[in-house]
Amino acid sequence: MKSILTALGLLIASSACAAPQLIAHRGGTGDAPENTLPAIKLALENKAEAIWITVQLSHDGVPVLYRPSDLSVLTDHTGKVSSFSAAELARMDAGWKWGGETHPWRGKNATIPTLQSVLEQWPQTFFYIDIKSPDADPAMMASRLSEVLQTTHSLSRVRVYSTEDRYIAALPESIPHFVSRGETRTKLANISLSHQCQPTTQPGDDYWYGLELKRKVEIVEKFTLGEGVSPATLTWDKEAMDCFRSQGKAHIVFFGINSADDFRTASELGADGVMVDSPAKAKTW
């Protein structure tokens, strides 16, 4: 009887500390050129459980995978993504700058894929889609994104994020998405700095939040004769987790988890997911 109770206790403890979902940041940017088909393939081989990808709109309105505001950052071309068609982008080498001076991915078919091609190639994989288009109209992005997700029957296996609240606000209700970064950051700031648990402004009872485990910010204080600015760090801890989870069903994903220590902290806090640059390293934690 004692051994049965001991085993049951271990099972309960194990369930309570279940490991968070391992999410490959930009397809696993630490192991291969970000947001490319080879990177996604490698990340899944390295046991990533979901893929985080970055999306912009091409000149012909096609959602494609690319993050920086200029093509010169990662490819052998210059200009904005929105200046080229999806077909033209598909011929560009997105592995051109990866790997320092050795450039091991040049000429290895690490091109700029369309979102539709990615979803069709991995029909069973969960994707987090990060909208980064610097010049796309939010309504247009929402419309084109919706078309692709419906065409590929992917609405049940995606969730959309953006650092710009306007892109989240423009999404139709049919597209699963995160609570805006602005609201998430403000809510965490109130807990971290003032120990106040701010009610959510979002309707419903199921919420997804995403933010860095530790986020450096500047606090602006206004005085009679001017303003004072002081640095501060927003940190997730038990108080923060309890607050977020006291208001409906909260799912929390931590960004920038790139060490065993941070992964352990995220696991102990009960994070639902962690975003890592290198699934190859993360699978050893």
For the regions a protein language model found, what residue spans apply to each?
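Positively charged n-region of N-terminal signal peptides that target proteins for export
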Residues: 1-5
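Phosphate-group recognition and catalysis centered on beta-loop-alpha active-site segments
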Residues: 17-285
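N-terminal signal peptide c-region/cleavage motif recognized by signal peptidases
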Residues: 13-15
